Amino acid sequence: MAAKDVKFGRTAREKMLRGVDILADAVKVTLGPKGRNVVIDKSFGAPRITKDGVSVAKEVELEDKFENMGAQMLREVASKTNDTAGDGTTTATVLGQAIVQEGAKAVAAGMNPMDLKRGIDLAVNEVVAELLKKAKKINTSEEVAQVGTISANGEAEIGKMIAEAMQKVGNEGVITVEEAKTAETELEVVEGMQFDRGYLSPYFVTNPEKMVADLEDAYILLHEKKLSNLQALLPVLEAVVQTSKPLLIIAEDVEGEALATLVVNKLRGGLKIAAVKAPGFGDRRKAMLEDIAILTGGQVISEDLGIKLESVTLDMLGRAKKVSISKENTTIVDGAGQKAEIDARVGQIKQQIEETTSDYDREKLQERLAKLAGGVAVIRVGGATEVEVKEKKDRVDDALNATRAAVEEGIVAGGGTALLRASTKITAKGVNADQEAGINIVRRAIQAPARQITTNAGEEASVIVGKILENTSETFGYNTANGEYGDLISLGIVDPVKVVRTALQNAASVAGLLITTEAMIAELPKKDAAPAGMPGGMGGMGGMDF
C-alpha cells in the first residue's frame, strides 16, 4: 500500500478552502445576464465555450490533491443540483463557497464546527419553507417563456420555443434537444404515440407520393408473438371487414402466408390494412405493447393471458382516430383509451423511474412516459459554427430544465432577490452562541448570488443590495440586463423555486461537511526512479553508415 500524506486542522481546511475558491471563482463568472463565458480546452477538436456552471465545474481538476478534494466536493454541489433541478448549478456553487468561507472563519475563531453546522441547517430549513410559501404557480404560456428566457441567459427566442413545445406536448411530454444541421433553431412536434417501426411491406402504402400509410379511425390488433398462419387471423379479419374500418396489426413479426394474404387483400381493395413489428425487445416489448393497449383501449393478445387469436372479438381491439406509418416510424394519434387507465399507467411508470438505479432503464422509462402522456417535441439548435451550437445547446438544456422545475413548484422573484429577502426573515434561534453563528453564516451567505450577479455586470453590489432591501415589496429588485429597478415578477425576471431551493440545500449540505472536516488523507506522489544509463557493449560500431 502506498504511503499517505495526512493533514490536520487548520492546514487541512486552508488547503481545502483554496480548492473550493479556485473552482467557485471559475464557475461564478458565468452567473447572471451579464455573466462571462468560460473557454475549456479539449484534448481533441475546438475549445468549448460555455456559460453552464456544471460544465465548467466538471473540467476543474487540480494538481494538489488536498486542494483537489475541496474542489471535488464543491463540484458535487453543482452536479447534484443539476441532477435534481437541471439548472441553478452556478447559484449552488456561489452559495457553497460563501457558506464555506464564512464557516472557515468561524472555526478559525475557535467555534465548535458541529454546532455551526446545526445552526446552518436550522436556518436553511427556515429559508426553504419561506421560499415555498412565497412561490407563485405558473399557468400561462408567457410565464413559461419568461422562465426559459432567463435560464437561457436572456435569449427570448429559446424561451418562446420551449413554451410552445410544452403547450403542444404537455408538461409530462418529452422535449429533446438536438444539434441542427442548419444555422436555424427550430421546433418539431410529434403528437400522439410514435415508435420506431415502419410498415412490413411497401404495398401497405396509401399515399405513394409521401410513401406513408394513413389509416383513419382504425382498429388495432396487438399480438405479442409472430403471425405466420392465416387461419388464426381469419375471424378477426372478417369481423373488421364487416365494419369497413381499417386495421393495423402490431405483432412480433408478420411473415409467410399471413403477410402475403394481407398484401393481396390490400391490393384488391377489399381490406384497408397495414402491419408493423412491435417496438422494443424482450420484456420491454411486452411493456410497450401494454402501453399501446392502454392508450387505444384494447387488449394485448397473449397466450400468457389465455387469449387465443382465433377467439379475438372486436371489443378486444384498440381504436385510434388516426394512424400514420412511414418506412421507419409508426404514429398513433388520439387513441380511444380511458383517461383514468392512462393516468394510472403513467403513475406506475413514474414509480418505476423513481425506483430504478440504471440510467439506461430510466431513459427508456422516460420515453415510454412521454409517449403515453401526449407526444414528443424536438428542439433543433442551430448556429454558424460547431462551437456556437454546442454553447447554445447547453443553454437550451438549462432553460428546458428550469421551465420544468417552474411548472412543478412555482416561481419566485429572480436575480437572487428571493434569497436576499429571505435573509431578513430568518427568525430561528440557536441553543448556544455557536449555533447562532451558524444561523448568521446563512444570513450572510444567501446574499452572495445577488451580489455576484451585480458584480458580473460591473456594478457596485453593496449599493444595489442595500437599495433592494430598503424597499418592502417582496418582488422589488434590480434588473441587471438594463440597469433598472422594478417589480421583477411583472418584468419576467423569475427563478423556479425548485432550482433555488435545491441549490441552497445542496450547498449547505456539502459546505457543512467541509466545515466539520478535521483531517485529510491523500496518497503521497511517487518519487520517480532515476533513468537507467545506456547499456554497455555498444562500442565497435564505427564505420557503419546510417
From Swiss-Prot:
It is found in: Cytoplasm. Disulfide bonds: none annotated. It is an enzyme of class 5 (isomerase). It holds the Pfam family Cpn60_TCP1. Keywords: ATP-binding, Chaperone, Cytoplasm, Isomerase, Nucleotide-binding. Its main location: cytoplasm. Together with its co-chaperonin GroES, plays an essential role in assisting protein folding. The GroEL-GroES system forms a nano-cage that allows encapsulation of the non-native substrate proteins and provides a physical environment optimized to promote and accelerate protein folding. Forms a cylinder of 14 subunits composed of two heptameric rings stacked back-to-back. Interacts with the co-chaperonin GroES. This is Chaperonin GroEL. The gene is groEL.
